[in-house]
């Protein structure tokens, strides 16, 4: 076997473990919730055929056509996901009136993602452990405690990294999809006519004859495609080919076979609706299936947690969240990170959901809103990619995006009516997250504007550097968000100490709209004269800044740094409300609170703490 084929096989197996955990565990609860959820549907052959047809065409349209075929083409330099798509679209729409509304839509998608990332671990592991109730109802009191123990273990190992355990994810998920397919085939052979539900006329007939019932059914059918957006989100890790091959070659057939197998089981035994997945095999298989299902749901949860870490880093780099501690858990993979604040926030929320909702059925009502909302926003954003990047004819854009948007809207509306039954949770988390993201973004914008107002032109400072101003030995690096003028920290140093270093570097760390900036394009150095330099350090939104490494990269450009003779000057800003505040008072207080609790710049930028001087600055915002 060639190295290329070995690598491809490895990528395929890895993709199974990371990309498909969420959608792969949907058979545990999707059909069960459709027929026995908050809006139960009578388990009749006619309804089973109608629902199966809806599931089949929903998976094909929303996952296969929308994500695998269309949206996965809209990569941002190889990266996918809502924030990567947002960065791409905001770049494409600069100068257009829709620029700001689209940016806000992307922020809403990121906010909804956090609601989704809290619900997925809870509902997935609960649904797996609930299989024990099929063995004996006596296990019911232990479902929540077992789920809590499993999830607690998962969150506590995050800080150690999951590289070693992650090697098992792919093989476990391959076994999982194999079991899904085999169980499906065995049950289909007992009722082979169930395959007729592939015909979309069954779905159409179900909708026409039972409009209200079918509307409620949509709210649960969408559970079959939760996790479909992960195919696009994880594209940066594996690339398009492995994800598409795994989808068409194993995941899609296994999922559809299992759903049709569950349908066949229900035709023969309608009482199996209480937990059709675990009734698909013989009794002796239930416990092994529970173990395998628990492993699969833990893997699905891990993928969501890792995704939350990645989104947090992207949001920080794109200026939507304050600095947080980011720990790299692998020396080889830049994408393997651990964000403590995100981890423990998710843990508290997940535990609250498990204890508060008690069952996967109760949680199912909360699940759909975040997913359908995100999918709807992805459709809107990719429509602009179709028009502005791919240059599709307007009629084609309207036809394709309009059709997908109508489908998304139908599913979103069907889930919106479940607000009282649990849908309030992702809505609440979405509102809180959106408020935090937009408040931080607006606050930083106000701070930048104020710093620009206070900044003194560089030529004025240069003229002020007369013979009476002492020049200290060594190098002073002033970190500043502005790419012109002189930062407040330098002015304070000059005012109070009457001295300037022999070399002064005005350094700005900039995040681009691209996920990665190659090392060769990282540094832009400009000599300003009289020992002054302006240094622009560029990173992608998927990268973590490292100031010492960036300074070392300046050596080939003629600027070498000795850390023992280099001092870093940082501004420590305190904020007071102005007479005409740029935000509501409560948002200014929230912004100040986030600033006070943000990770210190020295830690975030990896600056040696013994070489740092902080100078206080008071700003009105």
Swiss-Prot record:
Pfam families to which the protein is assigned, alphabetical: K_trans, K_trans_C
The reaction(s) this protein catalyses: K(+)(in) + H(+)(in) = K(+)(out) + H(+)(out)
GO MF annotation, one: potassium ion transmembrane transporter activity
Range of residues in the leader sequence: none
InterPro entries cross-referenced by the UniProt entry: K+_transporter (IPR003855), K_trans_C (IPR053952), K_trans_N (IPR053951), Kup (IPR023051)
Transmembrane segments: 11-31, 51-71, 103-123, 137-157, 165-185, 206-226, 247-267, 285-305, 337-357, 369-389, 392-412, 419-439
Keywords of the record: Cell inner membrane, Cell membrane, Ion transport, Membrane, Potassium, Potassium transport, Symport, Transmembrane, Transmembrane helix, Transport
Topology versus the membrane: Multi-pass membrane protein
UniProt subcellular location: Cell inner membrane
Entry GO CC: plasma membrane
Function in brief: Transport of potassium into the cell. Likely operates as a K(+):H(+) symporter.
Family: Belongs to the HAK/KUP transporter (TC 2.A.72) family.
The protein's name: Probable potassium transport system protein Kup 1
Native species: Rhodopseudomonas palustris (strain BisA53)
Gene: kup1
């Amino acid at each position: 076997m060639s190295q290329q084929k070995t690598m491809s096989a490895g990528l395929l197996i890895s993709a199974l473990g990371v990309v498909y955990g969420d959608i792969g565990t949907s058979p545990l609860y999707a059909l069960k919730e459709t027929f026995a959820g908050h809006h139960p549907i009578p388990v009749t052959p006619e309804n089973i055929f109608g629902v199966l047809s809806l599931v089949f065409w929903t998976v094909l349209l929303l996952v296969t056509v929308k994500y695998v075929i269309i949206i996965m083409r809209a990569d941002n330099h190889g990266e996918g996901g809502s924030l990567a798509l947002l960065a791409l679209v905001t770049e494409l729409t600069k100068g257009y009136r829709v620029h700001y509304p689209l940016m806000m839509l992307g922020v809403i998608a990121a906010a909804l993602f956090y609601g989704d990332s809290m619900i997925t671990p809870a509902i997935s592991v609960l649904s797996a452990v609930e299989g024990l109730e099929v063995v004996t109802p006596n296990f019911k009191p232990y479902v929540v405690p077992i789920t809590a123990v499993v999830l607690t273990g998962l969150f506590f190992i995050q800080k150690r990294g999951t590289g070693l355990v992650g090697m098992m994810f792919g093989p476990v998920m391959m076994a999982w999809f194999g079991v899904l397919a085999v169980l499906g085939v065995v049950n289909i052979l007992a009722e082979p006519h169930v395959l007729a539900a592939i015909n979309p006329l069954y779905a159409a007939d179900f909708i026409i004859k039972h409009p209200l019932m079918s509307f409620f059914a949509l709210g649960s059918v969408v559970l079959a495609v939760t996790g479909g957006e992960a195919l696009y989100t994880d594209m940066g890790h594996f690339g398009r080919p492995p994800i598409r091959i795994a989808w068409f070659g194993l995941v899609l057939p296994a999922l559809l076979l299992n759903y049709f197998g569950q349908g066949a089981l229900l035709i023969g035994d309608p009482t199996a609706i209480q937990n059709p997945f675990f009734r698909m095999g013989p009794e002796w298989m239930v416990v092994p299936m529970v173990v395998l299902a628990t492993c699969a749901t833990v893997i699905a949860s891990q993928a969501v947690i890792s995704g939350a870490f990645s989104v947090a880093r992207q949001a920080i780099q794109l200026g939507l969240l304050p600095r947080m501690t980011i720990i790299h858990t692998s020396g080889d993979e830049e994408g393997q990170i651990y964000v403590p604040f995100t981890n423990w926030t998710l843990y508290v929320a997940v535990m609250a959901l498990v204890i508060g909702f008690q069952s996967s059925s109760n949680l199912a009502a909360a699940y759909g809103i975040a997913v359908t909302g995100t999918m709807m926003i992805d459709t809107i954003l990719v429509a602009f990619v179709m028009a502005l990047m791919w240059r599709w004819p307007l009629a084609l854009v309207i036809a394709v995006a309009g059709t997908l948007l109508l489908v998304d809207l139908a599913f979103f509306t069907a889930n919106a009516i479940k607000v009282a039954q649990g849908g309030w949770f992702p809505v609440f988390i979405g509102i809180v997250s959106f408020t935090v993201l937009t408040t931080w973004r607006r606050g930083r914008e106000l701070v930048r504007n104020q710093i620009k107002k206070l900044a003194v032109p560089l030529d004025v400072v240069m003229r002020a550097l007369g013979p009476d101003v002492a020049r200290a030995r060594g190098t002073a690096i002033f970190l500043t968000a502005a790419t012109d003028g002189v930062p407040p920290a330098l002015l304070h140093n000059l005012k109070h100490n009457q001295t300037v270093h022999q070399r002064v570097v005005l350094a700005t760390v900039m995040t681009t709209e691209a996920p990665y900036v190659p090392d060769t394009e990282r540094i832009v150095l400009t000599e300003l004269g009289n020992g002054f330099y302006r240094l622009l350090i560029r990173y992608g939104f998927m990268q973590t800044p490292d100031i010492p490494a960036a300074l070392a990269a300046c050596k080939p450009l003629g600027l070498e740094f000795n850390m023992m003779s280099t001092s870093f000057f940082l501004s420590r800003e305190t904020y007071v409300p102005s007479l005409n505040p740029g935000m509501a008072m409560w948002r200014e207080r929230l912004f100040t609170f986030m600033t006070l609790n943000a990770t210190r710049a020295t830690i975030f930028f990896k600056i040696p703490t013994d070489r740092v001087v902080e100078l206080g600055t008071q700003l009105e915002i």
